[in-house]
Design a protein with these regions (language model features):
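Hydrophobic membrane-insertion alpha-helices, especially the h-region
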Residues: 17-30
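Solvent-exposed, non-transmembrane regions of membrane-associated and secreted proteins
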Residues: 29-154, 164-166, 176-233
Length: 233
């Protein structure tokens, strides 16, 4: 079974600081361009019993317990480094280009500049490499559903495909879904070192707080690499 190890390398520690600042600052992944506006509430995450949870429950611990269901065994070898160019989630009808996301001056993670693109955090591995690759997108934009509006409705076993600059495609299978108050973001589970190629999809969730201009939660989808397709010749 894939393991999320407790050790952290230098890159993971830097990323953890960044995302912790993001969660504490409350900048989120959807409020950009939506300040003080009413917006549609996305569907809640389909959290399995015993899984990563924070929705309609007592405050989630910093490092929630793993799902009681076994995660899918990675069946593909890790891939070489190659920048992601697009993402496809067949079960949601999602197809989106991918842009780069770095860190802002305040050490919080940048967010996509529109509601149609997905961002890859450049401080994380590329999809298919060893470790957790992090992709983020808005849940709403200008009061309308955006790329990851239905991310919380994903189920274990569904697939996510990421095309890469070298023409290859990394195929991931969802192993867990969690929804957390932004003040309880599971930094270690999302950014911590793992012994296989993994993917994390992040957006906002829960109700929209008109006073702060933000949704109150984060939704995280955890997935493992199960297949890779070579570039077409």
């Amino acid at each position: 079974m894939p393991q999320r190890t407790q050790g952290r390398d230098r890159r993971a520690k830097g990323v953890a600081v960044a995302v912790l600042a993001l969660a504490v600052a409350g900048s989120g992944l959807t409020a950009y361009g939506l300040s003080q506006q009413e917006t549609r509430t996305p569907p809640p995450a389909a959290v399995s019993e015993g899984g990563h949870a924070g929705h309609h429950m007592d405050p989630a611990p910093t490092s929630p317990s793993p799902s009681s269901d076994p995660a899918p065994e990675p069946t593909a070898e890790r891939m070489s480094r190659s920048r992601p160019t697009s993402i496809s989630i067949p079960s949601l009808g999602v197809s989106s280009s991918i842009t780069d996301l770095g860190l802002q001056a305040d050490r919080t993670m940048e967010v996509p500049q529109d509601g149609t693109s997905t961002g890859w955090f450049t401080g994380s591995p590329t999809p298919g490499e060893l470790g957790p690759s992090v992709l983020a997108a808005h849940v709403t934009w200008d009061k309308e559903p955006a790329v990851f509006f239905e991310l919380g409705s994903m189920r274990e076993g569904q697939r996510v495909e990421v095309e890469r600059a070298d023409g290859s495609t990394a195929v991931f299978e969802v192993s867990d879904i969690g929804q957390y108050p932004k003040t309880k973001f599971p930094t270690d589970d999302v950014y911590g070192e793992v012994d296989h190629a993994a993917l994390r999809l992040i957006t906002c969730g829960g109700h929209f707080d008109g006073e702060t201009g933000h949704h109150v939660d984060n939704v995280v989808v955890y997935a493992e690499l199960v297949d890779e397709r070579a570039a077409a010749r």
